[in-house]
Amino acid sequence: MLASVLIVAAGRGRRFGDPLPKQYLSVAGICSLRRCLDLFLSLGSIGAVQVVIHPEDMPLYSDAVAGLTDMRLLPPVAGGETRSKSVTCGLQALEAHTPDCVLVHDAARPFVSARIIADVLAALETSQAAFAAMPVVDALWRVEDGAALSPVSRDGLWRAQTP
């Protein structure tokens, strides 16, 4: 199975509070987007990588991809007003490549592992959709008007590793 990757990097990161969008922040000397690109482009199971960026971020994007010559990295496309619209823009750009499947990843999550990617691809061999998740282990409480009312059962709850 040859997968395409759609990396969503069009967000503004306003909740984060930094004027620079999270995907362009340096983590141990390498920007988050570049860490994602380096990982996905190191995998032989990836046939194309499409990045969706904010229309005003081309200079930041160019800095992030400086020196990358892998032909699987497609020219970036502009995102939409929301994350879902940005994903749609990216999927439309990938249509011509007719991938077997598309992995959607957020550029602000630089520490995904090759193992997690392999596990998701393996799940896609027998399923139409898959995502990385972890069981909920934290205590959960139902709160109303600032008062804790009752604990919530964690049975059957999983934390998706996506926003």
Predicted regions mapped to residue ranges:
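N-terminal glycine-rich phosphate-binding loop and ensuing alpha1 helix
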Residues: 2-59
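Structural beta-sheet core signal
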Residues: 5-7, 51, 104, 129-132
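Residue-level signal for inorganic ion chemistry
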Residues: 7, 33, 90, 105-106, ...
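Short, high-confidence coil segments that cap the C-terminus of an alpha-helix
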Residues: 46, 99, 126-129
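Acidic helix N-cap motif at the loop->helix transition within catalytic regions
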Residues: 59-65
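Short phosphate-binding loop-to-helix
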Residues: 66-101
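Acidic metal-phosphate-binding loop of nucleotide-sugar-dependent transferases
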Residues: 107-111
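Conserved core of the sugar-phosphate nucleotidyltransferase
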Residues: 112-163
